[in-house]
Amino acid sequence: MSLVPIVVEQTNRGERSYDIYSRLLKDRIIVLSDEINDVTASLVVAQMLFLEAEDPDKDIQLYINSPGGSVTAGFAIYDTMQYVKPDVSTICIGMAASMGAFLLAAGAKGKRFALPNSEIMIHQPLGGARGQATDIKIHAEQIIKIKNKLNRILSERTGQPFEKIERDTERDFFMSAEEAKAYGIVDEVMERRK
């Protein structure tokens, strides 16, 4: 069972209660704190589109604490981050692994942050296939295409050479917040809010 805190605010019309995530959304904060799947991607995408409609010139903050997940769901979030007019600032809290790290790097340049004790992990996409040999071959080729696309984008976002990204993502590659800054995944390790 998931518990979601309720925030009560006083207004000129009396009291108003919000779940904590709706209250944070009023301040243009989105929290991605779960596995990335179609459901979480739909929620994040909808919130970004809503915030763009509310004010297309004001930044959106995306807090990430995620073990990663589905590549296609992650690309839905990534593409929306690039599509919306407001800059999307990314902040790693806890862990940004796999697609979570990819989305962390996808934030607006100069606006990608990690808290000091957070961890970042990149690796190649995971997949599996069953069935006839021809179908398995088709799926394997598709995973290689996706791997190359992820590596190319990560190279562009970090400034690292494509070949280095290929080597580093061959296996799980863990980084501290400072190491992620040196790598180019984040721009700054932030100890206190500015």
Curated annotation (Swiss-Prot):
EC number: 3.4.21.92
Localization terms from the record: Cytoplasm
InterPro entries membership: ClpP, ClpP/crotonase-like_dom_sf, ClpP/TepA, ClpP_His_AS, ClpP_Ser_AS
Principal location listed in the UniProt entry: cytoplasm
GO biological process, one term: protein quality control for misfolded or incompletely synthesized proteins
Catalysed reaction equations from the record: Hydrolysis of proteins to small peptides in the presence of ATP and magnesium. alpha-casein is the usual test substrate. In the absence of ATP, only oligopeptides shorter than five residues are hydrolyzed (such as succinyl-Leu-Tyr-|-NHMec, and Leu-Tyr-Leu-|-Tyr-Trp, in which cleavage of the -Tyr-|-Leu- and -Tyr-|-Trp bonds also occurs)
Descriptive protein name: ATP-dependent Clp protease proteolytic subunit
Annotated source species: Acetivibrio thermocellus (strain ATCC 27405 / DSM 1237 / JCM 9322 / NBRC 103400 / NCIMB 10682 / NRRL B-4536 / VPI 7372)
Lineage start: Bacteria, Bacillati, Bacillota, Clostridia, Eubacteriales
